[in-house]
Amino acid sequence: MADQGTEGSQPVDLTKHPSGIVPTLQNIVSTVNLDCKLDLKAIALQARNAEYNPKRFAAVIMRIREPKTTALIFASGKMVCTGAKSEHLSKLAARKYARIVQKLGFPAKFKDFKIQNIVGSCDVKFPIRLEGLAYSHSAFSSYEPELFPGLIYRMKLPKIVLLIFVSGKIVITGAKMREETYTAFENIYPVLREFRKVQQ
């Protein structure tokens, strides 16, 4: 896929990524308004990749293979698309779902497409002293290892949540634009280095 950005074999642009690490986008959540009322039962009966169990959840769950995604389609015409690995693929998938709904006889449009959340991840390749980090950044951190093994770091600017694991694996969530994911990681990277665990 051409849209995967800087991941892979190309050299990293150090002006944008001084750490030399580019977080990989793992999941994009987007929404769009099909702008018409939908008969979910009819959609579930006619579309072969759809399931609908109104007692469990008030939406049709539909999946496509390319781009590998899942859509939640509501009777109001609102749709949520998850699972794409880039913004471009998320929009492409959402358009495919809209087209499926159109082919089933609904006057579906494609209004107000919006990226709602970008989840990225990376590995700094060194272990991190989470206790020390949590203590010195207590205003932004919550770390309760008996409940969850990662430290939850709530960055203010950009407004992003990072899950930081002792292994050096990082999950970055809450961005609406990939640049926020990258900025958040570059902001936290010096802190991670400061709390690098020294191997005995």
From Swiss-Prot:
Annotated keywords: Activator, DNA-binding, Nucleus, Repeat, Transcription, Transcription regulation
Source taxonomy: Eukaryota, Viridiplantae, Streptophyta, Embryophyta, Tracheophyta
HAMAP family linked to this entry: TATA_bind_prot_arch (MF_00408)
Keyword Lyase: no
Name this polypeptide is given: TATA-box-binding protein 2
Predominant subcellular localization, coarse grouping: nucleus
Effect of E146R: Unable to bind to TFIIB1
Sequence-type repeats, residues: 25-101, 115-192
Gene that this sequence comes from: TBP2
A matching Pfam family: TBP
GO terms under biological process: DNA-templated transcription initiation
Assembly and interaction partners: Belongs to the TFIID complex together with the TBP-associated factors (TAFs). Binds DNA as monomer. Interacts with TAF1 (via N-terminus). Interacts with TFIIB1. Interacts with PTF2. Interacts with HAT5/ATHB-1 and ATHB-7. Component of a nuclear protein complex containing at least TATA binding proteins (TBPs, e.g. TBP1 and TBP2) and ATX1.
Source organism (scientific name): Arabidopsis thaliana (Mouse-ear cress)
